[in-house]
Amino acid sequence: MLKAYKFRLYPTEIQKAYFANCFGCVRFVYNRMLNDKIEHYKETRQMLKNTPAQYKHEFPFLKDVDSLALANAQQNLEKAYKNFFRDKSVGFPNFKAKHKSKASYTTNNQGGNIRIENGKIKLPKIGFVKMKQHRDFEGLIKSCTLSMNKSGNYFISILVEQEAPQWLPAEHKIGIDLGIADFAITTNDAGESVKYANPKCLYQSEKKGKKAQRALSRKQKGSKNRDKARLVLAKKYEKIANQRKHFLHKLSNKITDENQVIVIETLSSRNLMKNHKLAKAIGDVSWFEFSRQLAYKAEWKGRTLIKADRFYPSSQICSACG
């Protein structure tokens, strides 16, 4: 099985400059390849098969970064095309804007060019980078994704191939009803119902986030104070995201640990978000992310996850009747 482990990185200033260069080159190659594909199709009505290597002569700066990072940018573009042709509602591949797209790149482990030694991880082209490894893992490193968030912190997600652990069958079956007033109401086969409220810390953090947003809006554009206020706001939102992830991971772990069969309703967040009165509340509760976590954790642990039809009136039927 494949499992990802995410850790904080503490690069030097030289390494930060290299990462910034990688982020930019990956974005450049993705956009250039997408643009050339579009123009070629307009002229010939055929798909262009282009690769990052053919751009290195025209743009020599691409030779300064990890070639595997550029190859993965190509794979991401090809995947975006496949998703579009498979389901048009996904949308045509978009160009990546510098300040809106995620600053990240992915590289692969080839011949042991990625390894961990003495609290540092060795990466292609840049060497050893200091890493805070808060937990150990076993298995073969397949790839790594380097990223930088809005507050300027660096992270690495290490994809590892390892043997799947043997989980014992759980005792119960459970149904999950998602909501807004309460995040979820669960009922198991023993008739035990539990309400899980949205964590109060989120509301407190969101108030501080709104205050930081107002402070940013009052700063003069282009000033250093505005840059400082933007960093403060980014850190506030980062804290909110981390609190939400912690809540979702804790709850999804509890449910998949204790139950062999899990039934959850499939809600179309995209359609529900069209209701402007509910849009923010629905966005805050993160139903999709919770369902995603349940799905992969259920697969890891040998549980059965059943997604009930979204038109089934689960919210209108009591646990005794349904």
Residue ranges with predicted function:
Residues 1-72:
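Gly/serine-rich nucleotide phosphate-binding loop at the start of the catalytic core
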Residues 2, 105-107, 137-140, 169, ...:
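Short solvent-exposed loop/turn micro-motifs enriched in small/polar/acidic residues
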Residues 4-8, 128, 143, 173:
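Well-ordered beta-strand positions in beta-sheet-rich domains
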Residues 7-9, 129-133, 196:
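Generic detection of short hydrophobic beta-strand segments and adjacent strand-loop junctions
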Residues 50-149:
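Acidic carboxylate diad motif detector
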